[in-house]
């Protein structure tokens, strides 16, 4: 008895359990419990009611025809929801008003049909695809199951490996053709069947097949197997390229030469391919690339009997070597060529002391003109210029067998990273024993590494050796520092690149003291004494001639660099009085003359590297010119400021980083168009065109000649005119505004009571009395201050008068020296011959003080053949000057160049003294001195007024 029934009070009627059922009959045949039956009955009744009421057509009579007659509905709906009624009305009205209602509907159905059709096709394709999968064995697997002969026929005529293998005879054609497939049949067929196919099995088969291949085809096969098997567990869907996949292993004929000639040598190309044995050494990694190189001979020559231009000993090529060191691959060996070039060609240890590669290759933070090019450390012996050991002198190609610098011996033993021999450096030491040019064989190789920070200091324009062709050693000494122009330029023959082999070993020794030699000019020496001294990583200093007992480029005995192969590293350490002597800064290839170079060294403590140019301690910075040509200004007197700037670019009165662009060849700063040499260094238009047209650097001698032709057209070229023109240039006005004056362009020499203080006042004051000396920057001392003083355009009123002379246009001076003026008698004032020189080029030619002018005139009078104002000797330092007698004896007392008196040179009026900027304390350019033609006569003691000498080369 069901408890629910018993508990129910029959007095109360119950709901019908189900439609058409009476309450009493439900329990008999309904399998559900009473409670569930009751719930079910309720649900059923609700369903029936909904069905009866909602299914009536009259309820939705208006909707029966697709809402075509909905016009009454909006009112009905509006009662309930006016907004909905409005929307409905709009919708229905729009629907009914569509002109192409049926067509729209048809289009909708058609679109739907297209979609459905696509879907149906996809479904059918999906359904049909499984049979393809099941038939996969008949695809690739079926081909794999074919007999070798069948495979051979079906392999395809384009399968190159089949021919290669059969011709090579390494395997039968059947094997060759099947080998790529050997592993795949199982993997592919089984993959089609099940994803659990053992990959190893296919791998084994593939490896077995590969073993039968030519080694050359193995690499591709191995890679192919690796690729296929790695993902072999994936089912391979039917592919159009399934057969091609079978042949991909043989699709690489490049490495499959039947001759088994290794196309490239690399052992790192593929890690696991035995075939790569053919590619023995291909690698961009220095680990293999450099080590692969042939063993280097101790002398650094190429292991082959070939003497490739003595490349191992070529400084230029060697300089490239250390840079290569950081390259991922050695440039000497092409990644594609095994052991191609002699490694030392580029790996020469000769530049053991080269800067770090990135430092050399990336322009320093302040890219000076010269620094733009890769600085190649110059050999300390001063011999190596970037191009062929010595400048562009190709004659220097042979190794310098004459002197085998001990430095080379030391270099071998030293553990430089680049030292191929002792240091175990990457690059074999190319200059081991072949007497390599001392340029890279520094005795002791004192600086194994140059601190790029030192080399590239913004204020110190270490001239990048890249343009060493301009360096002193160059066959053509192009516009060395203009102040030293006479040294190198005049004696161009000395500038010819004499390989260090010719330079006496003593020159490389730091102990050599040229101070004892008042002139310090040793004709036997190459144009630059310290061939390597000032060659900081940037390059050798321009002038190494010792002037007035001051070795311009030689390291001091007591200098920090005195010991070891840095003999010249302190290129211009001066042995003279450090206090008074105006030291010429050791010039890098590009450093401008800076006073007190020795003191700079001492103060700087060798700036960390002999190669790194010392910062100008006195002036606070070295010249800003980075052009290979040293910023021509000679070192200003120690006390003077670096105020003078070239008239051309007037970079502000500092020689520092803003120095005007200077032609690395001729040192000119005035040119209508700046060009660049292959090193990226600035060249004037003339030098650039010459180099472009002739392929060789333009000799300074040509420059001088050209200048004469161009600028001297208006003046008489009488020998005496030199005094006049010089007088004109060196008008008594000592004060020329420093801004207009070019560095080193003029030297203000004032003789004070006991010591001649070369002080140039930047102020444009009219020339002070003869006794008055200008206080000014050292540079100004070097360059005349344009101002009240006579300009080239104006003629000094009287050369002898100590009074100031009114001057014409300020600093307006033609590029060339003013046309020669009438030569005043020795005591006579220079004829006031005003040559109207167009201010075409603002050049401030220094005007000598009247007294000096008179002296000059006297000197010129005595020497009718005295140099013309801008004679090649004067401006460019042509060899003419060398021929001129230089009767120049400096008295010991006047040896100090801090004070430079006319008497200090002990020059007789008759003798034409060769005065170099170094003698004048670097304040005066040698050309200026020489141009004065015996700058000071013995009577010049009277000339107390500072004299400014501007020589053409300086400005140009």
Swiss-Prot record:
GO terms for molecular function: DNA-binding transcription factor activity, RNA polymerase II-specific; RNA polymerase II cis-regulatory region sequence-specific DNA binding; zinc ion binding. Its main location: nucleus. The keyword DNA-binding applies. Residues 42-51, 131-153, 167-194, 208-217, 588-613, 713-760, 849-863, 872-881 have a biased composition (Polar residues). Keywords: Activator, DNA-binding, Metal-binding, Nitrate assimilation, Nucleus, Transcription, Transcription regulation, Zinc, Zinc-finger. InterPro entries: AreA_GATA, Transcription_factor_GATA, Znf_GATA, Znf_NHR/GATA. Residues 15-37, 623-633, 640-661, 812-839 have a biased composition (Low complexity). A zinc finger (GATA-type) spans 663-687. Pfam families: GATA, GATA_AreA. It comes from the Eukaryota. Signal peptide: none annotated. This is Nitrogen regulatory protein NUT1. It comes from Pyricularia oryzae (strain 70-15 / ATCC MYA-4617 / FGSC 8958). The gene is NUT1.
